[in-house]
C-alpha cells in the first residue's frame, strides 16, 4: 500500500542554479555594482554613512518590461538624490498569500496558472541583470531556501516578510545570505519576533538547502551581522510614530542589538491605503529631520500607474499598474523621495 506522495500530483525537474547562472552570468562590472551597493547599505546600517536607505518599487513584478521602465526612471532619481539617499529598487518576484492567489512572477510567470517555474526563474534573473547593468541596486523578499541560489548574487538587500519572520527556516536562510536583510514585525504588530529574528540570524546555522548543481545539501552559515527590523504596522494599528519608533529602538538596545530600524510606509502603517503613504513618509521625515539617527531606511510601494487592478484578463491589463497591493503612481512618488532627501540634509545639520 502506498504511503507517500498521496496528495502530490507530480514533481517536475527544477533547473539547476548553475545552469541558469551560466546562461545569464553576472558581469564583472555588475559584480562591482552589487558589492558596492551592499557595502553602502551596510555602512548606513552601522552609522558610518548618514544617508537613508530607501527601498522603493512595485508591490510585485508581474511585467518585466514595465519593471524595467520603472527602473530607468528610478535610476535617474537615484543619481540626483544620491548624496542623501541610497535608493534600492523593490523587485519582489514572490508573494506570500494570506490564503490563496497569484504567488508571483517566479511561481506563475504567465499569470495563467501554468506555473512554469523554470521560466519564472529565468525572467527574474534576466530583469535583475538588466537593473545591475543600469547601475540600480535591487531588493527582494525571500520566501524559501532554494530560490536565492538562482538570483541572490544580483541582490543588494533582502527582506523576510511579516508572515515568515518567526519561521526558523527563514531565520536560518537570512544567516547565510550575502546581503543585509530586514525582518518585518509580525502581522499582529508584534516587534519582538523581528528582534528575535535579527538575533538568531546573526548566529551560525546548519539547515537543508540545495547546491548550485541542484543537489540537496546541508548548508552551514557564518551568521549575518547586517540584519535589522522593519516596522510595518499590524492589526493593532501603525507603528511609524515617534513613540513606537523609540520603543523599538529601546527594545533593540535592551537585546544588545544595534538601535536601527527601517520603516515601511505601506501595509499596516498606511492601513492598506496606498494614498496614505506620503503622509506616513512625512511623519517619518519629520523624525529624521529632528535628528533621529536610528531610522536608517524607509520602504515605499510605488509603480508607474497609481492604484491596483484585478488579474481577470491578462491580455487587457493596465500597463504599469500593480496586480497585487495598490501602489503610489510615479508622479506621487518623486516628491516623497525629495522630502526624504531634505530630511536627511536637515538631520545632517542637526547632528553636526
Give the ranges of each region predicted by the language model.
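N- or domain-start disorder-to-order transition segments that initiate the globular core
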Residues: 6-48
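Gly-rich Lys/Arg/Thr-decorated short loops/hinges at beta-loop-alpha junctions or inter-strand turns
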Residues: 17-25, 221-235, 317, 321
Amino acid at each position: 500500500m502506498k504511503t507517500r506522495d498521496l496528495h502530490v500530483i507530480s514533481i517536475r525537474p527544477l533547473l539547476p542554479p548553475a545552469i541558469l547562472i551560466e546562461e545569464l552570468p553576472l558581469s564583472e562590472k555588475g559584480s562591482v555594482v552589487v558589492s558596492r551597493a551592499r557595502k553602502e547599505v551596510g555602512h548606513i546600517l552601522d552609522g558610518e554613512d548618514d544617508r537613508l536607505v530607501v527601498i522603493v518599487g512595485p508591490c510585485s513584478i508581474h511585467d518585466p518590461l514595465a519593471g524595467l521602465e520603472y527602473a530607468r526612471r528610478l535610476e535617474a532619481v537615484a543619481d540626483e538624490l544620491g548624496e542623501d539617499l541610497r535608493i534600492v529598487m523593490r523587485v519582489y518576484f514572490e508573494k506570500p498569500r494570506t490564503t490563496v492567489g497569484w504567488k508571483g512572477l517566479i511561481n506563475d510567470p504567465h499569470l495563467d496558472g501554468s506555473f512554469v517555474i523554470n521560466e519564472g526563474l529565468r525572467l527574474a534573473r534576466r530583469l535583475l541583470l538588466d537593473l545591475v547593468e543600469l547601475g540600480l541596486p535591487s531588493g527582494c523578499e525571500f520566501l524559501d531556501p532554494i530560490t536565492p541560489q538562482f538570483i541572490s548574487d544580483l541582490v543588494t538587500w533582502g527582506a523576510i516578510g511579516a508572515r515568515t519572520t518567526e519561521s526558523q527556516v527563514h531565520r536560518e536562510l537570512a544567516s547565510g545570505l550575502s546581503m543585509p536583510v530586514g525582518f518585518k514585525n509580525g502581522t499582529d504588530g508584534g516587534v519582538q519576533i523581528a528582534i528575535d529574528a535579527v538575533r538568531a540570524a546573526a548566529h551560525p546555522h546548519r539547515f537543508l538547502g540545495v547546491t548550485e548543481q541542484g543537489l540537496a545539501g546541508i548548508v552551514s552559515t557564518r551568521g549575518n551581522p547586517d540584519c535589522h527590523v522593519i516596522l510595518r504596522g499590524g492589526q493593532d494599528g501603525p507603528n511609524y510614530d515617534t513613540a513606537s519608533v523609540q520603543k523599538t529602538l529601546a527594545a533593540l538596545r535592551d537585546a544588545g542589538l544595534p538601535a536601527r530600524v527601517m520603516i515601511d510606509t505601506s501595509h499596516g502603517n498606511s492601513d492598506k491605503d496606498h494614498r496614505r503613504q506620503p503622509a506616513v513618509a512625512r511623519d517619518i521625515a519629520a523624525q529624521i529631520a529632528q535628528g533621529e539617527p536610528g531610522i536608517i531606511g524607509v520602504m515605499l510601494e510605488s509603480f508607474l500607474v497609481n492604484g491596483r487592478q484585478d488579474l481577470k484578463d491578462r491580455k487587457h491589463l493596465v500597463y504599469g499598474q500593480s496586480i497585487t497591493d495598490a501602489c503610489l503612481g510615479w508622479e506621487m512618488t518623486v516628491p516623497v523621495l525629495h522630502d526624504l532627501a531634505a530630511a536627511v540634509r536637515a538631520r545632517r545639520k542637526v547632528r553636526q
